[in-house]
């Protein structure tokens, strides 16, 4: 019996060993960052026809001039024009009723029930109180699913911009972006190798100080970035949230595949502002044990942070350039190129989509749009090699509010959230990139971009006679050309050109979508504001005059009371003096009485006179007291 049992255990161990070896063999660097080169079962695009039709999208970019012997160049010299193809957007479904039920089952959020309108049905409660946007995703080829995290907010007022709390929820979608509700994944813990059972949708267990009646609690702006753990993929969810004292907003990551390990990041020897956001995460291929962040673009500051304790060092910094705009605000997590290509030693290149925030341009007070960026590391140096102008992927961007037309609101918001996947799909080198994004703080959608790698590989920069060599993509890959002063000047010029082009884009966007109407609306709002300011000014003047009148009246009353008090004090002193004098006379008379005999009749007369004087004084005091009392009652 024991022999048979041992044989059975040996067989089971052998099978598990084979499975484990298979897992280790199938996990490779080509899958890192949601990027697969296999094109087979690991591909996110088994059926290219399911992606829909691709439409042309012209893209203008600006490339740094790396050659010192070239002349001072203008934006036209640095520009590169190419063509991409893009699909229509695909809006991602989200069963908010299902997610709401999950959230309310958690003790810390159960109090939300009391803030909902109790007269409504569940469907009506969801429509009024619950909102979702900012979905960020990565493709997991090991599981054939897209892993997406999104922000879900609850508003007692029924306004998305006035949340009571903000919650991050993880979902999975199949290759065709169908939501998988109630599904589960058996996941290998990326650091221990133990199997972890995860059911989706999944409310990420992020600590929050939910206080009934308070607002803006919880995690915001989720972004997911994929790293390679020792035993498999480890999607890290980055977010910002208030600290436990509710006084500071900091950057955190949580690892859903590693027992929800959560880390808060802190920069050593650096005074961090009260509110932190817009950090851009990326990983070095040869160092997956630390996460890097682009902390800001001006100054260009790069951090290296521990995934264990969150301590960060500033590993690269170019001082702030006052003449350079700071309109680049955050970006998607950065990923490497989709295939291994020859590159200079100790050099690495990432692609990302930062966003611009441009004020008072086109048909909106604020316009947010993505750009394309090529970010480069040479040794310990980092810099931006390429920036495009604004991209809208051919969309009529949803209005933030208003009547539904593109220029009917004060804000035009198209935010890139993450690069879900980027892979070469055929032997001809054709590539597809999937980007998740949000519009107007309302939606989560994806589009598919075809030919981005080819766009970059065909890149040509300045080729004038003064240039030693043409600045093409091959040169970017093979040369080490970082020079502190030159690189700073190059980045200033490229960013200036790209932002000028972005401003030109939003002006054109407004002209073709109702700029005249916007100007009329702005003029009306300006007049309304001026009228309100004038009324406010008049009201303030009237209030000041009334305040002055009250102060003067108060002073008069105080002066009258002061004089009356002085008069009363004088009369009191006078009475005290009379009383004292009377006491002296009485004492004198008593002494005289003791010193000599007085006729009884004379004594009686003097006593009567004394009593009469005392009576008159008392009567006078009584009348004066009655008079004062009457005057007080009259007041």
UniProtKB/Swiss-Prot annotation:
Species name: Komagataella phaffii (strain ATCC 76273 / CBS 7435 / CECT 11047 / NRRL Y-11430 / Wegner 21-1) (Yeast)
Keyword Electron transport: no
Membrane topology: Single-pass type II membrane protein
Glycosylation sites: 484
Stretch forming the signal peptide: none
A Gene Ontology cellular-component term: microtubule cytoskeleton
Membrane-spanning parts: 7-27
The protein's role, per its UniProt record: Beta-mannosyltransferase involved in cell wall biosynthesis. Initiates the beta-mannosylation of core N-linked glycans.
The protein's name: Beta-mannosyltransferase 2
Topological region Extracellular: 28-635
């Amino acid at each position: 019996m024991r022999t048979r049992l041992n044989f059975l255990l040996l067989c089971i161990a052998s099978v598990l060993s084979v499975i484990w070896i298979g897992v280790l063999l199938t996990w490779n660097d080509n899958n890192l960052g949601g990027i697969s080169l296999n094109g087979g079962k690991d591909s996110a695009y088994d059926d290219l026809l399911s992606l829909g039709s691709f439409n042309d999208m012209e893209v203008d970019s600006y490339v740094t001039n790396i050659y010192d012997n070239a002349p001072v160049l203008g934006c036209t010299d640095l520009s590169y024009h190419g063509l991409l193809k893009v699909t229509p957007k695909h809006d991602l479904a989200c069963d908010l009723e299902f997610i709401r039920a999950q959230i309310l089952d958690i003790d810390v959020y159960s109090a939300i029930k009391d803030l909902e309108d109790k007269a409504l049905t569940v469907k009506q409660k969801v429509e009024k109180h619950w909102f979702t946007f900012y979905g960020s995703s990565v493709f997991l080829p090991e599981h054939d699913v897209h892993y997406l995290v999104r922000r879900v907010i609850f508003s007692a007022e029924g306004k998305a911009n006035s949340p009571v709390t903000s919650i991050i929820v993880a979902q999975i979608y199949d290759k065709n972006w169908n939501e998988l509700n109630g599904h589960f994944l058996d996941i290998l813990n990326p650091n221990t190798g133990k199997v972890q059972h995860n059911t989706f949708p999944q409310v990420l267990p992020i600590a929050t100080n939910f206080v009934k009646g308070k607002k803006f609690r919880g995690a915001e702006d989720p972004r997911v970035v994929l790293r390679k753990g020792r035993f498999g993929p480890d999607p890290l969810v980055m977010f910002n949230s208030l600290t436990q004292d509710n006084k500071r907003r900091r950057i955190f990551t949580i690892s859903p595949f590693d027992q929800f390990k959560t880390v808060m990041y802190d920069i050593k020897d650096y005074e961090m502002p009260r509110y932190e956001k817009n950090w851009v995460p990326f990983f070095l291929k040869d160092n997956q044990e630390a996460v890097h962040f682009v902390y800001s673009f001006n100054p260009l500051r790069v951090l290296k942070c521990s995934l264990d304790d969150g301590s960060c060092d500033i590993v690269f910094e170019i001082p702030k350039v006052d003449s350079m705009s700071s309109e680049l605000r955050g970006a998607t997590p950065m990923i490497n190129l989709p295939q291994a290509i020859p590159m200079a030693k100790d050099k690495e290149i990432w692609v990302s989509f930062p966003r611009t925030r441009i004020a008072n341009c086109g048909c909106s007070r604020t316009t947010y749009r993505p750009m394309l960026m090529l970010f480069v590391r040479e040794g310990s140096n980092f810099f931006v090699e390429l920036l495009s102008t604004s991209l809208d992927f051919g969309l009529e961007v949803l209005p933030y509010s208003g009547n539904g037309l593109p220029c009917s609101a004060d804000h035009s918001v198209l935010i890139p959230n993450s690069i879900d996947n980027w892979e070469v799909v055929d032997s001809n080198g054709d590539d597809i990139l999937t980007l998740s994004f949000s519009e107007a703080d309302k939606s989560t959608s994806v589009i598919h971009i075809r030919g981005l790698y080819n766009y970059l590989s065909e890149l040509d920069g300045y080729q004038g006679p003064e240039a030693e060599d043409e600045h093409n993509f091959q040169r970017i890959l093979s040369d080490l050309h970082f020079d502190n002063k030159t690189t700073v000047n190059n980045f200033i010029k490229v960013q200036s050109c790209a932002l000028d082009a972005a401003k030109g884009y939003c002006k054109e966007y407004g002209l073709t979508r109702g700029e005249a109407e916007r100007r009329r609306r702005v003029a009306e709002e300006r007049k309304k504001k001026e009228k309100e300011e004038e009324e406010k000014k008049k009201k303030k003047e009237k209030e000041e005059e009334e305040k002055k009148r009250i102060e003067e009246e108060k002073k008069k009353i105080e002066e009258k009371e002061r004089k009356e008090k002085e008069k009363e004090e004088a009369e009191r002193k006078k009475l005290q003096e009379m009383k004292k004098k009377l006491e002296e006379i009485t004492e004198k008379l008593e002494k005289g009485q003791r010193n000599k005999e007085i006729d009884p009749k004379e004594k009686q007369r003097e006593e009567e006179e004394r009593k009469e004087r005392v009576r008159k004084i008392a009567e006078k005091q009584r009348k004066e007291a009655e008079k004062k009392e009457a005057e007080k009652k009259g007041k």
